[in-house]
A protein has these predicted regions:
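Active-site-proximal or metal-binding-adjacent scaffold patches in catalytic folds
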Residues: 1-73, 82-118
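Walker B catalytic acidic pair
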Residues: 78
Length: 118
């Protein structure tokens, strides 16, 4: 049985992670400040977009996510992108050296599969 993704569930997953290391030290926005959307993309399991007006959006695909574990891993991946954006660590390369360093820290703490961050 697969879980049914909703924007509310995405926000709850975000808030859960945001209260754990290392996210709780990253000064990320509260969940209510982020727009969460469920997509049906077969190509992208998730994506983060930061806008010039300071707003944020995280989208997660229901076609890629069937378990709570996978949802949490993909949300954590997008939260690394969010952290890079808010800390001004982004480059033209979506996954730069800083991303992989932060992702390794998240995977080590939460015992996530590093392939979810590739």
């Amino acid at each position: 049985m697969t879980i049914k993704l909703t924007p509310e569930l995405l926000e709850w997953a975000y808030e859960l992670l945001n209260h754990t290391e290392p996210f709780d030290n990253w000064n990320l926005p509260d969940g209510h400040e982020i727009k969460f959307e469920v997509t049906k993309s077969a190509k992208d399991c998730g994506d983060y977009t930061g806008y010039t007006d300071g707003t944020h959006r995280i989208r997660i695909s229901s076609r890629c996510i069937g378990t709570l574990q996978k949802l949490i891993e993909i949300m954590a991946h997008e939260m690394v992108h969010l952290h890079q954006a808010t800390a001004r660590m982004e480059t033209k390369s979506q996954h730069n050296a800083a991303f992989y360093k932060l992702a390794a820290q998240v995977c080590r703490i939460h015992k996530f599969d590093p392939k979810a961050f590739a």
